[in-house]
Amino acid sequence: GIVNVEDIPEDIKLSEQQQFAVDSAKHANEGELEIDKLAVQSFLDLLTYPLYHFDFETFQQSIPEFKGVSSYQQIPFQYSLHIDHSDDSLTHKEFLGEEGTDPRQSLVEQLVRDIPLNVTTLAFNASFEQMVLKGLAKQFPQHKDHLLNISSNIVDLAMPFQKKHYYLPEMKGKYSIKIVLPLLVPEMEKAYKDLDLIHNGGEAMQAFAMLGEMTDKDLIRRYRESLLSYCELDTLAMVKILKVLKG
């Protein structure tokens, strides 16, 4: 029988996905970057400027404290927005809810001011942002049209990696931002490690849920600053990934 991927004969019949996996494994040590330049360019052609790089942070409650929320529903409490102007200059906007309160209404009111109608918004694995926006549109019908407009104009930055139009064998067929970012923008890995208290989405979720119980004002301030720094880095990471795609 065949034990190693190297032993698979060249003439064996495989599905497209299997063939891709075999080729990737065979060339994994060669570090060959594969770019479908036409496909990447047609992705870049979807983008209009100014371009809104967008990321939500959410938390969940097993027993909901807020009106209209079900158990374990994703409740957005924070977002970061890097606005990428056509001349490569950036504007940063952000929102972080007040601890111990329902952050949704304030978040929605600022979001519809920060992201105008009919602009291109970029998110990584955009289905998550779209799910949260659609949930908010139901909960805040007065802003429904604007929120659904943002959702329908989201472009997924994961697309070129998911479709393997930009592929490194080290990705091993995976395309999450945790896989893509260190390969394309290695210096960002250190930036995340250098953050103070929050280094990933799980820590952000736990921190916001805990903040309402905290009494130490210095610690609250430190956690809030850490949350803002972490979320800002997430959208800056998207700016950097896009820059690599543009070549």
Regions found by a protein language model. Give the residues of each.
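Active-site proximal loops enriched in glycine and acidic residues that flank catalytic Cys/His/Asp
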Residues: F56-T58, S62, L81-H85, F124-A126, ...
